[in-house]
């Protein structure tokens, strides 16, 4: 039986976005909105949908966690040998999307993607909880087939024996950070009657950003 949602409606009335009052830098607005999401206790405000597309022209999307906002983009960490890592190796273009229902906001980020410095990746890996470090070694190759959950648990237990709590877990060479260097970023604020506010920043040749309002 089909599920019909055509009668479902929600009026967005929690905010507004004015082109004349936004900062020159999109990163200032990104940080401000992220701060508000944290203050409003949005669950997992750092969670973003990451869309990639490999040489096969088949798009893939999944949730990853934002770990840093830099002066040129955003950083997340993952397994370089994962499906997303293979996509990125074949096509260094990606998009990320934050959606915060509680604030009736979304942020769409487009840009080129590349690995960050290996030392920086290692430094972050060593900051992670011990068991998360161990779990990274279990997921190799990430998205690879496994016979059962028991096999995963046994591998995890063996690695915990090899690297007991307090022992240094080596940083995997197959794991690290990526940075999306922003070329375009859109801020969306829900409004009543589908008259949503959409302000997009576009990176110019000289590195500055221009803004424009888009129709909802």
From Swiss-Prot:
It catalyses: pyridoxamine 5'-phosphate + O2 + H2O = pyridoxal 5'-phosphate + H2O2 + NH4(+); pyridoxine 5'-phosphate + O2 = pyridoxal 5'-phosphate + H2O2. It is an enzyme of class 1 (oxidoreductase). Its EC number is 1.4.3.5. FMN binds at residues 62-67, 77-78, 84, 106, 142-143, 188, 198. One of its GO terms (biological process) is pyridoxine biosynthetic process. Keywords: Flavoprotein, FMN, Oxidoreductase, Pyridoxine biosynthesis. Disulfide bonds: none annotated. Pfam families: PNP_phzG_C, PNPOx_N. One of its GO terms (molecular function) is FMN binding. Its cofactor is FMN. Pathway: Cofactor metabolism; pyridoxal 5'-phosphate salvage; pyridoxal 5'-phosphate from pyridoxamine 5'-phosphate: step 1/1; Cofactor metabolism; pyridoxal 5'-phosphate salvage; pyridoxal 5'-phosphate from pyridoxine 5'-phosphate: step 1/1. Homodimer. Belongs to the pyridoxamine 5'-phosphate oxidase family. Catalyzes the oxidation of either pyridoxine 5'-phosphate (PNP) or pyridoxamine 5'-phosphate (PMP) into pyridoxal 5'-phosphate (PLP). This is Pyridoxine/pyridoxamine 5'-phosphate oxidase. The lineage of its organism: Bacteria, Pseudomonadati, Pseudomonadota, Gammaproteobacteria, Moraxellales.
